[in-house]
């Protein structure tokens, strides 16, 4: 079982904690991580792109000249795709790009991401995070105590509005619960700060 230091929010060490081996101690699967990132990024696409076909463009689309006798190529409509102002053929239409990977694959990706944080020594486990009032300075002081000056992801076991509101003004800090954990946030933040309860909960949920 991977063993990491258990810290107070001021950065002082209070001992060690053993993490669930099947969640925090596996060999990261880079292929599955890639698949999960592609899936999540696809789900973020708006998919609102659209063009007008020949039935939707402005104008009546009358026949420009008679069928025979002019010596020119026959034309059926001034809104045919080859005409200026005509419709577009096979253009993009609004669609959803989102799709789902199997649940087992998604969980393996999360376990791989968490294990890679342990391997990189980028995981900090706190006894708990306690803030009396929602103030940005409180989170700043916690990060200073932990000597974290990079992008940080804070993971809680339950939603705590005081902590969330305290971090709202910090561009490089994101606060999530265990249920909200996702691949992009795990990989895009340099440091993962997780409470003891959240680490234990993740060990149960993702095992």
From Swiss-Prot:
InterPro entries: Ribosomal_uL4, Ribosomal_uL4-like, Ribosomal_uL4_dom_sf. Signal peptide: none annotated. Gene3D superfamilies: 3.40.1370.10. One of its GO terms (molecular function) is structural constituent of ribosome. One of its GO terms (cellular component) is ribosome. Residues 45-80 are annotated as: Disordered. Keywords: Ribonucleoprotein, Ribosomal protein, RNA-binding, rRNA-binding. Residues 60-71 have a biased composition (Basic residues). The keyword Ribosomal protein applies. It comes from the Bacteria. The keyword Ribosomal protein applies. Belongs to the universal ribosomal protein uL4 family. This is Large ribosomal subunit protein uL4. It comes from Oceanobacillus iheyensis (strain DSM 14371 / CIP 107618 / JCM 11309 / KCTC 3954 / HTE831). The lineage of its organism: Bacteria, Bacillati, Bacillota, Bacilli, Bacillales.
